[in-house]
Amino acid sequence: GEVARTGLHGANRLASNSLLEAVVYSGRASRDIIERWKNGDLGEFIGRLPRWRSEDLGLLIENMPLITDLAALRSTMTQDVGLVKSDYRLERAERRVEHIEKEVSRYWKSCKPTQELIELRNLVLVSKLVVDASKSRRNNVGLHFNMDLV
């Protein structure tokens, strides 16, 4: 539902996943993918996907740095990108998320992925998108409230 970004249920949705959006839009997306696959239209897209390499990657020995990065990401998103925002705090969050992204990228490039590493990498990406969206919104609507826009 959140990924569909339809605005179907307005701005006051909090973090609920709309069953309607989840079912309808995922169904439409899957039918489109299947149809494109049958027609051979996915070749260009598949050709752009990076090749997976794992032969030369080592194992992630310890998860403590990932746990620390996850805690820092959670804290940043809660404190600086929560219900009440400001331009300064969004800039600060952007810098912190970029720093965490660099740390996670080092592990991603040097280690075979673990569930924890994949999840953290995905959370960093979502955090970047949320921060970018919050920075680009120049009016207070629904649950988006920026003190500098009052």
Regions of interest found by a model, annotated:
Residues 3-150:
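Glycine- and aromatic-enriched mobile tails/lids
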